[in-house]
């Protein structure tokens, strides 16, 4: 059995601009943004956090390596990625940026060098900005550096 260890790591979609929908409650055009995972290890995603100018955003994720989607259809980001505890603006100060993450029931394993496509659409009727973090661990083979003789 190969020895493995996990290192905490965060991948993120940063400063994603989402075009306004035609009106509140109307789903806008889905826009794709990609996130490339490193080629040095698998990644075990364990929780999501996000901050946006308005949390009325629909999202869906597709893993390009397998072509599989994480959901059967687009979901409101608030229902799958937790939510900011104090406010929801991208311009939060350090004191205000307290997040309530959305932990996964089981880690979601992403293969090395995978590209994840986030499809996002505004539902608020206003131009939206989004940042989203994937919290988890890089799964590495071999002895942990802190356990080496």
Regions found by a protein language model. Give the residues of each.
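Beta-strand-centric surfaces of beta-sandwich/beta-rich domains
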Residues: 1-149
């Amino acid at each position: 059995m190969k020895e493995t260890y996990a290192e905490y790591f965060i991948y993120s979609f940063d400063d994603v601009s989402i075009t306004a929908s035609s009106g509140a409650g109307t789903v806008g055009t889905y826009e794709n943004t990609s996130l490339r995972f490193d080629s040095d290890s698998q990644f075990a995603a364990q929780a999501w956090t996000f901050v946006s100018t308005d949390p009325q955003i629909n999202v869906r994720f597709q893993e390009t390596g397998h072509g599989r989607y994480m959901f059967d259809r687009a979901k409101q980001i608030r229902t799958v990625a937790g939510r900011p505890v104090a406010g929801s603006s991208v311009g939060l100060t350090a004191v205000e940026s307290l997040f309530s993450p959305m932990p996964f029931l089981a880690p979601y394993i992403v293969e090395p060098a995978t590209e994840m496509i986030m499809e996002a659409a505004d539902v608020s009727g206003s131009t939206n900005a989004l940042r989203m973090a994937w919290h988890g661990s890089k799964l590495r083979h071999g002895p942990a550096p802190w356990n080496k003789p």
